């Protein structure tokens, strides 16, 4: 008989991105959509952003992260993953709530793209004005 592997789940959202995150005790490997995080995300700054919950809780290298993410662009996806990791860490140990909350990692960022209005070229950009 095998023991069930301990795993913590968290769902993160940002803009139009949704990330389903699973934390498994391990060496600190991060896999996004079955690819290594360095292969999936093009910028080092996004990877640093994504690791912020581990830095705040001082758990870097304690968990392997398995992520399924869809929707949005690279930045939205990275921040959705960060949100999901923070929620999963909270499930792993409720003691982390204070430090994660102070760092603003548990709050869902509500900012979304503003819709285009009729008669305008974009959300707020109006057509070019011609005096004559």
Curated annotation (Swiss-Prot):
Disulfide bonds: none annotated. GO terms for biological process: translation. Gene3D superfamilies: 3.30.230.10. It comes from the Bacteria. Residues 101-132 are annotated as: Disordered. Residues 113-132 have a biased composition (Basic residues). GO terms for cellular component: cytosolic small ribosomal subunit. Keywords: Ribonucleoprotein, Ribosomal protein. HAMAP family: Ribosomal_uS9_B (MF_00532_B). PANTHER family: RIBOSOMAL PROTEIN S9, SMALL RIBOSOMAL SUBUNIT PROTEIN US9M. Belongs to the universal ribosomal protein uS9 family. This is Small ribosomal subunit protein uS9. It comes from Staphylococcus aureus (strain NCTC 8325 / PS 47). The lineage of its organism: Bacteria, Bacillati, Bacillota, Bacilli, Bacillales.
């Amino acid at each position: 008989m095998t023991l069930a592997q301990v795993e913590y789940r968290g769902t993160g959202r940002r803009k139009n991105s949704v990330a389903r995150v699973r934390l498994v005790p391990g060496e600190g490997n991060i896999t996004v959509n079955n690819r290594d995080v360095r292969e999936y995300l093009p910028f080092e700054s996004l990877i640093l952003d994504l690791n912020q919950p581990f830095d705040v809780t001082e758990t870097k290298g304690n968990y392997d992260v398995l992520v399924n993410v869809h929707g949005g662009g690279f930045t939205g996806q990275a921040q959705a993953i960060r949100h999901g990791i923070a929620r999963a860490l909270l499930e792993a140990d409720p003691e982390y709530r204070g430090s994660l909350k102070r760092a603003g990692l548990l709050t869902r960022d509500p900012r979304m793209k503003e819709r285009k209005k009729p008669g305008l070229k974009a959300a707020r950009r109006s057509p070019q004005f011609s005096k004559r």
